[in-house]
């Protein structure tokens, strides 16, 4: 029988190069630890939000300042933001200043008052000091005769605000999506970038995507009426927000569904509905509303527009997990009503968009989703709602969309938006 071996312990002798290697490794680890400690003590920055109120004696309050898309309001907001940008970008806080945004105008006995939200990135240990610096910088610069802004003495100057509430306010303006993006597609296409289309939502039954929709207020969506042909009970529906279906930013239950009174499932007219969420969403960079155009808003044939959704990538094709986008063109109703296209089926409440050559188009599952256009300020407006078509990307069969301007008064009557 074999006997087990005898364990003999030997004294380990470290070679010089091994000792040197271990020493270097320990010194490197110590250096990294010290570096991290210094970073978190000195450079670790936190976002801080401050609300400031200003008095503008040179401007009289007008009702246009309460109208979201009025030129007077948008122009004055931009002028104020530009002045605050210049003040901080030319100051000792230029590396900490992020942005400012006017959130409200108020009437005053002798002018206008403006509430502004200002965003900074500040090292944690210096927050109090830099807040005082910001206060002093504003006071000094606003004393200049060149400034249209004066301090509103009736309120504390810089009031700190909760981050979530501040982001909600900063993103409360409608239609701020990405910069005009490059060509992409739904059919045959490319996924949309994160935060490209923050108003896009998914209408789902039992967790399955059925239709798209557009966020037009913190508690309201607009979509196609035909999405509810088979499932009319609001309790069956949930709404998902975010670029991917599998990992949404947030979800909401549906409180109510209002379908246009004249809609009938056997025809395409009046294919519009609004959906009220069970509770409001909190706006953020990745989740906020699209602008609704005035009823008089005009768009010309050949104008570039975008349609987005989680519909099929091609006729009878697979459905994506990530939001898709496609750039197409407006086609006049006269062209779309030609015999070889839709032969007179396009009414004044519809928009025709795509290409007569086919290929680029919305598809099954995109119903209810947005057709949007950008203005020269990079504000995105909801022109249409994916409604119907023949196949996907078929020659002489572009997509047909519910014309939002035609139903603008109806939307307002149901949502007060």
UniProtKB/Swiss-Prot annotation:
Glycan-carrying positions: 60
Keywords annotated in UniProt: Disulfide bond, Glycoprotein, Hydrolase, Membrane, Protease, Serine protease, Signal-anchor, Transmembrane, Transmembrane helix, Zymogen
Principal EC category: hydrolase
Main location: membrane
Residues the record marks as active site: 226 (charge relay system), 271 (charge relay system), 367 (charge relay system)
Disulfide bonds: 211-227, 336-352, 363-392
Domain annotation Peptidase S1: ranges: 186-416
Origin: domain of life: Eukaryota
PROSITE patterns in the record: SEA, TRYPSIN_DOM, TRYPSIN_SER
Keyword Cell membrane: no
Residue intervals passing through the bilayer: 22-42
Domain SEA: 46-165
Topological domain ranges for the Extracellular compartment: 43-417
Topological domains, Cytoplasmic: 1-21
SUPFAM superfamilies, A to Z: SEA domain (SSF82671), Trypsin-like serine proteases (SSF50494)
Enzyme Commission designation: 3.4.21.-
Example GO biological process: proteolysis
Membrane topology category: Single-pass type II membrane protein
Keyword Disulfide bond among UniProt keywords: yes
Similarity comment: Belongs to the peptidase S1 family.
Name by which UniProt lists this protein: Transmembrane protease serine 11G
Organism: Mus musculus
Name of the gene: Tmprss11g
């Amino acid at each position: 029988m074999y006997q087990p071996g005898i364990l003999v312990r030997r004294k380990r002798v470290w070679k010089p190069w091994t000792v040197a290697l271990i020493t270097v490794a320990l010194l490197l680890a110590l250096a990294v630890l010290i570096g991290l400690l210094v970073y978190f003590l000195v450079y670790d920055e936190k976002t801080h939000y401050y609300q400031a109120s200003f008095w503008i004696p040179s401007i009289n309050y007008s009702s246009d300042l309460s109208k979201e898309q009025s030129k007077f309001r948008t122009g004055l907001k931009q002028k104020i933001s530009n002045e605050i940008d210049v003040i901080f970008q030319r100051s000792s806080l230029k590396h900490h200043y992020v942005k400012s945004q006017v959130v409200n105008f108020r009437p005053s006995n002798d002018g206008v008052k403006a509430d502004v939200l200002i965003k900074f990135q500040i090292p944690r240990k210096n927050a109090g000091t830099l807040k005082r610096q910001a206060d002093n910088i504003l006071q000094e610069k606003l004393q200049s005769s060149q400034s249209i802004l004066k301090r509103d003495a009736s309120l504390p100057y810089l009031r700190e605000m909760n981050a979530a509430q501040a982001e909600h306010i900063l993103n409360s303006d409608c239609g701020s999506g990405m910069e005009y993006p490059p060509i992409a597609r739904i059919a045959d296409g490319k996924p949309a970038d994160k935060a490209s289309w923050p108003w896009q939502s998914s209408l789902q039954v039992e967790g399955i995507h059925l239709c798209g929709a557009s966020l037009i207020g913190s508690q309201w969506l607009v979509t196609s009426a035909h999405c509810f042909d088979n499932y009319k009970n609001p309790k069956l529906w949930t709404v998902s927000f975010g670029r991917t279906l599998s990992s949404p930013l947030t979800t909401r239950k549906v409180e109510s569904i209002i379908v246009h009174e004249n809609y009938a499932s056997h025809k395409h007219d009046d294919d519009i509905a609004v959906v009220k969420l069970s509770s409001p969403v909190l706006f953020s960079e990745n989740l906020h509303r699209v602008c609704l155009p005035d009823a008089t808003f005009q768009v010309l044939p050949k104008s570039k527009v975008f349609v987005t959704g989680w519909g099929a990538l091609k006729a009878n094709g697979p459905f994506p997990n990530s939001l898709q986008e496609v750039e197409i063109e407006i086609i006049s109703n006269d062209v779309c009503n030609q015999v070889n296209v839709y032969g007179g089926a396009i009414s004044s409440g519809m928009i025709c968009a795509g290409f007569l050559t086919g290929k680029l188009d919305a598809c099954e599952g995109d119903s209810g989703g947005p057709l949007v256009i950008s203005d020269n300020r990079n504000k995105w407006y909801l022109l249409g709602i994916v409604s119907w078509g023949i196949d996907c990307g078929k020659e002489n069969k572009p997509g047909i969309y519910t014309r939002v301007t035609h139903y603008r008064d109806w939307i307002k009557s149901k949502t007060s938006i």
